[in-house]
Amino acid sequence: METQAPIIAFLYDFDKTLCTTDMEDYAFIPSLGYTPAEFWGRANAFGWENRMDGLLAYMYTMIQECAAQNIKLDRAFLNHCGESIQLFPGVREWFARINAFGESLGVQVEHYVISSGLREIIEGSGIAQEFREIYACEFYYNENGDACWPKLDVNFTNKTQFVYRINKGILDVSRDKELNDSMPDDSKRVPFTNMIYMGDGLSDVPCMKMMRVYGGQAIAVYQASNRQGRTGGFHFPGRLPGGHGAGPHRPGHPPENDHHRPAAGGQQPPAPQHRRRCASQSGGAVLNTEYLNDRKTGAENAPVFSVFPGKSLYLQYRFC
């Protein structure tokens, strides 16, 4: 009987991990006539005022704003918005190259998205076919094809559910009973030790912690402009000055001064305290999304996701 090759699973956040900013910022929000700060300000304020999950708040705001402006919010429209996504250099080529590298080592490489963004927008990004499964927020569509209800919400510790699904090979989100049934470790499709998680924001920390606890690997992605990050720090919230900049962002990617959002009852929520945390405390390493050191020359001139000297894979990262 033929023995199946070991499976190595790459698990990715999407926004600011594979692409340069929140996916809604490229085309969806401009189609409403808003700036990203204006839209996220509205969505975040609505969530604060109603003590609402932040992702459900932004999905509700999407439905309401499109209805107010007579924009048909259907799957085709959101797929079209995904065509404007700007991926980091090398991302499109990454999948074929790492797959080939894995094959040369006798392992099967699989890719999964676990994102607080929208599945429908990711489907239009041009790389959706690279993923075995995409776990992201998703709408339910009525008989007219209009988005009318959140079908799936992927947020913070909820993200860990999908790590377990990949671990057990139970990818269908409607199969709750099987997911919670006991399963011997030797029957699990992808061991935690064969998982590599990449993410950049607050919503990724629980999955990073899982990787650390169960023997997988986690890589914290940061921008080159975040000087503190380059020295090994992983910062919350907003990754401090030099990160994403000021103004409201989607929940899970809070900016440095996100404390101006109104809280329930009209009160201002307290200003966040800048908490330093080493990436290794959250389960892994720090990966620069813009430059990697060339091992031979030491020059910082190689874009991320494309540093493959010969047949050796160099995901250049450093532990705290």
PLM features: what roles do these ranges have?
Residues 2-143:
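Alpha-helical substrate-recognition element adjacent to the catalytic core
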Residues 23, 124, 206, 305, ...:
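Residue-level recognition of conserved structural "scaffold" positions that shape functional pockets
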Residues 25-27, 212, 308, 313:
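Hydrophobic alpha-helical membrane context
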Residues 62-64, 160, 166-168, 295, ...:
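Generic alpha-helical secondary structure signal
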Residues 288-319:
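Positively charged N-terminal leader segments that act as targeting/secretion signals
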